[in-house]
């Protein structure tokens, strides 16, 4: 018994093997949809990775700046000759000036023993000035808030009464900003 061959209505023998144009177009549409959804997922993944990377970078920068500020601030008032060096000269919400006698000669050298940390209005750069000009410490600073405490722990604005400084830094771009805080107690005060 011979296999039956299919014929179209005009009597022409129809092909039974291969793909038609419709099959090819359907496969192309399905493949394109899969590619588009894959591209969308890759794009979302890239955005999430960039956001996380920016946040980690902001956190590392903020920690570095905070550690540097607090470490230097703890040295404020260092006066081995007991010459009466005032530890804090300026105590403002976004500017702090302090000094220490690192070489022990009884005189504060303004080019290396007097330090200013500041965030200028309208800028997003935390700067440190130790006599050589205000050099950038970190960028993308959204906020620097300095608050000062006296011996009893009460807030003060008098530089002569400062015994501790609370430092709050907000660093990073909108949506990935990081806030770090610490309190540095001045170790070299005469009670």
Regions inferred by a protein language model and the residue ranges of each:
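Aliphatic-rich helix starts adjacent to a transmembrane/signal segment
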Residues: 2-4, 17-78
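Short, glycine/small-hydrophobic-rich surface segments
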Residues: 50, 57, 73-100
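Generic detector of solvent-exposed, compositionally biased contiguous segments
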Residues: 64-86, 135-152
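Type IV pilin-like appendage domain
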Residues: 89-154
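Residues that act as N-cap/strand-start positions at coil-to-secondary-structure junctions
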Residues: 82, 109-113, 178
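Short linear sequence signals and composition-biased patches located at protein termini or domain-edge surfaces
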Residues: 2-8, 47, 57, 102, ...
